[in-house]
Regions:
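Structural stabilizers in ordered domains
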Residues: 1-371
């Protein structure tokens, strides 16, 4: 079970449809950084600029994270501080300041990197500021996060917009009890939550979460938490709805990763399947992993043309066969039983009877609550 494009849009408000975040990547970004931002890269063959230099150019050099402050709160404060600076400029100077701010937001927050420097691979896409809003930045965020989760060797090695995973867990796995609601009805959903600061060690936190996941009935997972939400408060949903519920390739410059929606949708008998995307580029094919480019000048609109065509055609629809939670739980239990649980403390249930009863009980409780 993983976040989907609909989750990204509802939680962050970032577009997940439209033009793919793709183009040409370079071995050096020194020339575009100097020309479009008026700054310098760290090294000649680098795609990083100093965060402090970016903030200083926007007159917000001292805007650092405060203790207990979330990324969302930090960026809101940074935006407010930079607003006055942006309002004072006109013409080319205003465009340069806006590109600096967008580079900071995209390179540090949406497509975050390890350490303090800010990535600027997105800079060529910001040359024409009038088209910046047409890109599917939310889909790029998800591709970047998937790639990070698939390559990280330690719990602390994940990069990307981690608050997405936190809020996603608050809705889909409420039994974890990790978040505190603060602004009921606010949209995007990210604004509704206050992130609790846990003083325990990271190892201890991860261990506790693993223990809970090992023993919780799968009937307590909320597959469709958006049911009951008013879409009227989020008008941007209708625009990108055609991208929901589909197997599709996600693009983030030199990272191209498949979203296997069949592995997360409420479909019957497909959760353990491996969905392979047909491709003519067999030497590249690594199911479940991303395509990451080497340090060469690469035009990704040509190099991954087949995957880009898939995006432009909005992938392939995944239809759910389950008409109710009870149907889903019954079929799931019959098909997998206790095999889907990795925890050693969960009782062996080869015929899926415990899982079946849990699913029926959960469905009955929900029906009672709806009365």
């Amino acid at each position: 079970m993983i976040p989907t494009l609909e989750d990204v849009l509802r939680i962050t408000g970032l577009r997940v449809g439209g033009q793919a975040v793709t183009g040409t990547t370079y071995t050096s970004y020194q020339e575009p950084v100097e020309r479009l931002l008026g700054l310098e890269v760290r090294r000649e063959r680098s795609s990083l600029v100093q965060r402090t230099a970016l903030q200083a150019s926007l007159a917000v050099a001292n805007a650092c994270h405060q203790t207990g402050e979330s990324q969302v709160e930090y960026m809101a404060r940074l935006t407010e501080d930079a607003r006055a600076m942006l309002a004072e400029e006109e013409g080319d100077a205003a465009d340069k300041d806006l590109r600096r701010f967008l580079t900071l937001v995209i390179g540090k927050l949406i497509l975050g990197t390890r350490g303090d420097p800010v990535g600027c691979r997105c800079l060529p896409l910001l040359k024409d500021l009038s088209s910046e809003g047409n890109y599917a930045w939310g889909a790029a965020l998800l591709a970047h996060l998937f790639d990070s989760l698939g390559t990280s060797s330690r719990e602390t090695g994940v990069v990307g917009f981690f608050p997405l995973l936190q809020v996603w867990a608050y809705y889909h796995l409420p039994f974890l009890g990790r978040g505190v609601a603060r602004r009921r009805g606010a949209v995007p959903l990210l604004q509704r939550w206050r992130f609790c600061r846990d003083e325990q060690s990271l190892w201890r936190q991860v261990t506790l979460i693993h223990d809970i996941l090992d023993t919780i009935p799968f009937g307590h997972v909320r597959w469709t938490p958006s049911v009951g939400e008013s879409d009227a408060a989020q008008p941007w949903l209708e625009q990108d709805r055609p991208y929901f519920g589909r197997d599709i390739w996600l693009h983030c410059l030199n990272t191209v990763v498949p979203l296997h929606h069949r592995l997360v949708a409420r479909t019957l008998g497909l959760h353990q399947a491996v969905v392979e995307f047909p491709t003519q580029q067999r030497p590249w094919e690594r199911p479940g992993r991303s395509f990451r480019g080497i340090q060469l000048v690469t035009d990704w609109t040509v190099w991954v043309r087949e995957q880009l065509d898939d995006w432009e055609q909005r992938g392939r629809e995944v239809a759910s066969e389950a008409t109710s939670d009870e149907d889903y739980f019954r079929a799931y239990a019959r098909r997998y039983g206790a095999q889907v649980y990795k925890g050693t403390r969960r009782p062996l249930d080869p015929e899926g009877r415990i899982s079946l009863l849990e699913g029926i009980l959960h469905s009955t409780i929900q029906q009672r609550d709806d009365l």
